Amino acid sequence: RIPSSAASDVYKRQPSDMMDGRIGLIRKNLDKHRYQDVQILSYAVKYASSFYGPFRNAVGTKGILKGDKKTYQMDFKNKNEALREVSIDIKEGADMVMVKPGMPYLDIISLIKKQFQIPIIAYQVSGEYSLIMNGIKRNIINEKAIIESLISFKRAGANAIVTYFADRILKYL
């Protein structure tokens, strides 16, 4: 079933759970209900990462949620799985892909860019943000590290970036 918001101002869908076949099912249902213009952002490359820790602490889910996301998120040591999952999701109808977290996987962004003709969204997660902010607060690095980190995504091949620094980078634009 397609939510009514798909017919209004929402033109993208992004299932973040990475379950196999999810993109194909969403595309099939969107097309069936004449929402061919709704784009799908695939979270095909979502690593089981320690960099999610600060977010889980901030929202209070660290000790509450049961189960282990490592059962469906990717092993950070594996690059071939990322390329395989991107290929599958493109065949199922994905219009763009997310790489999450971003900074530790700049090589993966670059490989996807070289192998596929699809927009890539890099997600700079809470742990990446925390590392940079702690460095700035302790005067270990300066605030220009924010821009440097974002430029690295673009240089690797990302078409867009999701970051907790959005409000801070406005002064650099």
Which ranges hold each PLM region?
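Generic hydrophobic/aromatic pocket-lining and core-packing "Φ" positions
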Residues: 23, 86-87, 109, 150
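Conserved, mostly hydrophobic/aromatic
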Residues: 26, 89, 153
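Alpha-helix-loop-beta-strand connector modules within alpha/beta enzyme cores
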Residues: 20-50, 105-131
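Single conserved hydrophobic/aromatic residue that forms the stacking wall/gate
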Residues: 1-7, 11
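Active-site mouth loops of central-metabolism enzymes
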Residues: 62-83, 132-147
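Glycine-enriched alpha-helix->loop->beta-strand junction motifs that scaffold or abut catalytic
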Residues: 9, 30-36, 61, 93-95, ...
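Extended, intrinsically disordered, low-complexity segments
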Residues: 124-135, 143-173
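Hydrophobic faces of well-ordered beta-strands that scaffold small-molecule active sites
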Residues: 13-15, 40-43, 97-99, 120-123, ...
